[in-house]
């Protein structure tokens, strides 16, 4: 709906656009899982901010929201789809690339390792595919991402946006941020940053989002 709104009624508007929406959402719950099938979803869209300043603005907004809600042990876990997708794009084994992405979407790391072990890809590439989605921690983990990609033959600065995010956040927002490269989201339209916000005692995220430039660029 947001894409349709922007491409029709707002196509002549000055960028960037800052939009907010609130709507009821119905989702299927697993049997006996408990909880409501309908809830209110509040969302924010920043459209036309193509640089890392947009990432900083949105993550800062999420951090402020969880702080204002006084959620216990609130934290934001971020990643990027770019390193893993670029790694898979470099694979000659296209079946491995497709299966590896499916396994990460499903959090099936046993299946991922089995599929990687059966591939004839170079060992450095196979090691990177297995390890990269397991990486998590503070900003120091970004160095390990770069090292894995470099050994696999990928030298593009694919963690640059995440480093800029850390540098651009206010100290109180950076304190609740960590990284996890298993966060890929099952929607293939994401093109860079992805994130989830959690609160203590709740197994599911209270918020999530990411960058999806390609939807608006064609």
Predicted regions and their residues:
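Glycine-rich, mobile lid/loop segments that gate access to catalytic sites or pores
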Residues: 75-86
């Amino acid at each position: 709906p947001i894409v349709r709104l922007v491409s029709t009624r707002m196509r002549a508007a000055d960028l960037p656009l800052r939009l907010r929406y609130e709507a009821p959402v119905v989702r299927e719950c697993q049997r006996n899982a408990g909880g409501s099938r309908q809830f209110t979803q509040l969302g924010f869209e920043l459209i036309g901010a193509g640089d890392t300043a947009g990432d900083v603005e949105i993550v800062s907004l999420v951090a402020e929201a969880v702080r204002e809600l006084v959620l216990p042990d609130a934290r934001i876990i971020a990643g990027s789809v770019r390193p893993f997708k670029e790694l898979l794009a470099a694979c000659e084994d296209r079946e491995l690339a497709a299966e590896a992405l499916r396994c990460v979407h499903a959090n099936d790391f046993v299946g991922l390792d089995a599929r990687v072990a059966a591939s004839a890809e170079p060992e450095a590439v196979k090691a990177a595919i297995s390890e990269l989605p397991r990486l998590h921690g503070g900003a120091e983990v970004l160095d390990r991402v770069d090292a894995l990609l470099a050994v696999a033959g990928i030298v593009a600065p694919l963690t640059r946006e995440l480093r800029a995010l850390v540098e651009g956040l206010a100290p109180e927002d950076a304190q609740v941020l960590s990284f996890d490269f298993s966060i890929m989201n099952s929607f293939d339209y994401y093109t860079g940053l992805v994130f989830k916000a959690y609160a203590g005692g709740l197994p599911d995220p209270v918020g999530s989002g990411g960058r999806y430039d390609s939807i608006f660029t064609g």
